[in-house]
Design a protein with these regions (language model features):
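Active-site beta-strand-loop-beta-strand hairpin of nuclease catalytic cores
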Residues: 57-73, 79
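Short beta-strand-loop-alpha-helix junction that forms the active-site gateway
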Residues: 74-91
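Nucleic-acid nuclease catalytic cores
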Residues: 104-132
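Intrinsically disordered, low-complexity terminal regions enriched in charged/polar residues
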Residues: 128-171
């Protein structure tokens, strides 16, 4: 039986997939038994898989068929140390970015979808997309010593501002 935390995380991944399915009108689904099948030490498995199979094991969400370059990792936690973002180092976020980028390929749009109890839903994307993606008026920029600079904004606001741009860039 899965732990309460794992069940909570799986629910968030399903929520993200359902939201994107509704937004784009194509199926987005949670990766079954999501984990690092092709990430980290398992990256060698990519050499034996088709592009469609690789897409099915990247991140936590299998994107719709017209989004081959979209890589989404989902995290749902009780709390998050937001103060560490402005203090310059957030080990928790760096760990999640490690997980996200481990299975990423060059040219992917890498998105970290986060949800925290009583705080809301957030999304992080790499700053080099800022010319293409909009961040709106309220956002946080976080510089990771390992993964460069990321923009963190409200989850729903990101998709409202950038749904067309994501589709164009993820093909």
């Amino acid at each position: 039986m899965p732990s309460k935390g794992k069940t909570k995380g799986n629910g968030w991944e399903r929520e993200v997939a359902a939201s994107l399915t509704e937004l784009y009108g194509e199926p987005f689904v949670r990766v079954p038994n999501s984990g690092a099948f092709i990430g980290g030490k398992n990256a060698h498995r990519k050499s034996n898989l088709s592009e469609e199979q690789i897409r099915g094991f990247k991140g936590d969400i299998i994107p719709g068929p017209s989004f081959p370059k979209l890589n989404i990792e989902g995290k749902f936690y009780a709390d998050f140390p937001f103060h560490q973002l402005v203090q310059g180092s957030c080990k928790q976020l760096d760990q999640w970015l490690d997980q996200l980028l481990t299975s990423a390929d060059e040219g992917d749009i890498n998105i970290l979808a986060m949800k925290f109890n009583r705080k809301g839903k957030f999304l992080a994307f790499q700053d080099h997309h800022l010319g293409t993606f909009q961040a709106g008026d309220s956002y946080i920029r976080y510089h990771s010593s390992n993964h460069g600079t990321w923009t963190i904004i409200d989850f729903d606001t990101f998709w409202q501002l950038n749904s067309a741009q994501v589709k164009a860039q993820a093909q």
